[in-house]
Amino acid sequence: MKRIAVISLLAATALLGSCRFVTIKDSESSLSKGVSASETTRKADEEKIVNRYDVGEFDSVVCSGAFDINYNSGSCEVKVEATERDMEGLKVYVEDRTLHMEFTKKNLLGKKSDIDVYMRSDTLNSLEINGAAEFDSHGGLKAGKQFNLTVNGASDIEIDSLEAEFIRINTNGAADAKIAGINASELNIQVNGAADIRLAGKTVSTQIEINGAGDIDTSHLQSESFSKRVNGRVVR
């Protein structure tokens, strides 16, 4: 009799050892089999962190990547908000008064990301954007004698006011730019590709060259002298 009881107990123990228990708290709870851990990891990957960069003085910017850039005039400052994953391989540095923002080879230039950049400088004389970035300067920007804007790729540019003696704009690709409050002696625009550019303000002289399916709206731009060489469309 004791032998039967011992055998039964051993069998029950073996059965219990082979069972896999799943705890269900309620209809809104997750199963306790690793799902909550993966959800926690995913949420951690989605949470943004803030990095501030002590880069020194700069008056030119070169950005290569899918950034969402907010620019204002003021003391030089660079702040980046992104997930830890998107921060990987990000390089931010100043060389010869030019702020560079770029990724290492481990990251793709135009990969989908959600990287918010907040930057300030006393003046901005040159801006170059490579990739599918967004650049907004709702407070406008101050330039020196000359301002150069170069856009390579499908970036969106919005500048509320821009003042310089000479302004040069060069786009290659499907750029979308809206620049208002222009105050310049000379404005020179060269478009290669399918850019969509809207301009407003005042200039003494304006020269436009389009190669491709570019579309430039200058209906709100006052200019004493206007010349164009176009293989595209200019709305005047």
What do the predicted segments below correspond to?
Residues 1-236:
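Intrinsically disordered, low-complexity terminal regions
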